[in-house]
Structures are given as C-alpha cells and as structure tokens.
C-alpha cells in the first residue's frame, strides 16, 4: 500500500520550480480566478518555513506592506502556482524564522548569501 502512495505522489511532484530555501526572498506568481477572468497575482516576500515533503510540501512567505504583515502559505506542487522567482538568497541558521514576526524595520532583515 505504501509503495502505491509513494508512486502516486512521485507523479504529482513538480520539477520545473527553482531551488529555494528558508530566508530567501521570492516572488510567487499565483493564478487567481475572478469570475470568468483569470489573472496572475505576484506575492513577494521572505520564506519563513518549508513544511513536509514530496507532494504535500508547503512553504510560507511573509511580507510587510503599508505596516501590515501578510503571511501566505502555498503548496509547492499546486497547479495554481505559475512560477517562483528567487529575488535574493538569504543566509539564516534556522529552519523556521518565526522570530521575524516580532521584529520591525531593519531588525527584520535577513543577511544575503553570496
């Protein structure tokens, strides 16, 4: 039974997305359907965490706009994600960057990896 589940999950995993890590600044191009129209919405922010693995993998992106913090969680293998662009590579020592939620301004910056 386990082999069947792994085989199905292996078919659903996307290979066309770039490699990105926690701390990276990414642009997520997401398809949004409004009535009959379909458009692409871009959400740019810092990757706070990556969870699970395989077909069920998700990642959370945080961005602060007009002094309001917004966090969105995306499934990596979702067909609604058109593409992911890595804008900046971040250098962090943690797998989950929850401490950034308490930081404001320059204190919430992540060092750049060269």
Curated annotation (Swiss-Prot):
InterPro entries: Ribosomal_bL19 (IPR001857), Ribosomal_bL19_CS (IPR018257), Ribosomal_bL19_sf (IPR038657), Translation_prot_SH3-like_sf (IPR008991)
Record-linked NCBIfam families: rplS_bact
Entry GO MF terms: structural constituent of ribosome
HAMAP family named among the record's database cross-references: Ribosomal_bL19
SUPFAM superfamilies listed in its UniProt record: Translation proteins SH3-like domain
Keyword Ribonucleoprotein: yes
Alphabetized PANTHER family for the sequence: LARGE RIBOSOMAL SUBUNIT PROTEIN BL19M (PTHR15680:SF9), RIBOSOMAL PROTEIN L19 (PTHR15680)
Function: This protein is located at the 30S-50S ribosomal subunit interface and may play a role in the structure and function of the aminoacyl-tRNA binding site.
Keywords: Ribonucleoprotein, Ribosomal protein
Organism annotation: Clostridium botulinum (strain Loch Maree / Type A3)
GO CC entries: cytosolic large ribosomal subunit
Family, as annotated: Belongs to the bacterial ribosomal protein bL19 family.
Signal peptide residue numbers: none
Pfam family, one: Ribosomal_L19
Biological process terms in GO annotation: translation
Protein name: Large ribosomal subunit protein bL19
Gene that this sequence comes from: rplS
């Amino acid at each position: 039974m386990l082999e069947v589940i792994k085989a199905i999950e292996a078919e659903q995993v996307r290979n066309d997305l770039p490699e990105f890590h926690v701390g990276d600044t990414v642009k997520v191009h997401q398809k949004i359907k409004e009535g009959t129209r379909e458009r692409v919405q871009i959400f740019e922010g810092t990757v706070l965490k990556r969870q699970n693995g395989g077909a069920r993998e998700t990642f959370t992106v945080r961005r602060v706009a007009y002094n309001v913090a917004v966090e969105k969680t995306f499934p990596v293998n979702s067909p609604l994600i058109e593409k992911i662009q890595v804008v900046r590579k971040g250098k962090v020592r943690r797998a989950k960057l929850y401490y950034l939620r308490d930081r404001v301004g320059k204190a919430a910056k992540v060092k750049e990896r060269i």
